[in-house]
Amino acid sequence: MINRDLIRRKIVQLTYAYYQNGNHNMDNAEKELLFSLSKAYDLYNYMLQLIVAVTKEARKRYDVELARAQREGAEAPSQKFAFNRFAVQLEENKMLGDWIDAKHSSWDDDIEFVRKLYTNITASEVFQEYMASEEDNYEADREAWRKFYKNFVMSNEELDALLEEKSLYWNDDKEVVDTFVLKTIKRFEQENKADQELLPEYKDLEDRDFARKLFRSTILNCDQYQRYMSDASRNWDFSRLLTWMWLSCRLPLQRW
């Protein structure tokens, strides 16, 4: 999941922080980079877990409605959303389960947000279309959750604020993580059952080494890059350039 574009983005942010905080400890800065990247992967799993949390809430509502229908002799409610095939498969996914166990992760502390998200989804036109559709199969269930995620999880200001409170590392990561979640939903296949592979933290170990080497090279060769910038822009008024803009110009020199 952690690709080279995300790595470069993180390096720009952390190189800026490296020079701003004045504590030029390369080893600590490198550890911070790798930790920041690992937090992006945590967010990816946490967003997948949100789908499971909403599904569990739907199942609780279904159980209440079913019990009421049985008492009153009424027609049983639809279980289409509560037992959405894709969401059930995700709930049983071994890789996600291992991550949840390792991180002791849960949405229980934010159940009110989960309930609000459930309400927003079930009150929507896209939900009504899903429930009314005669297409009742795995592919339709998977596509429904792709739409729910795109419409109600992406660009969700309340969720953004909630995530920022949980980790400052997630403040700038959600937009790119959302694309990986949508990619993951699209890749799910029913026949893979609980063994469906999620995106790995790194596509290969070379990407982790790439992050370390690029970061070190950017820091260690800073003075040389500064001379390059000065020679290439003699007529610029550097006193009016923002540090962030200047830093962003340096990193492309290190594109490998």
Residue positions per predicted region:
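Class I Rossmann-like S-adenosyl-L-methionine
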Residues: 1-256
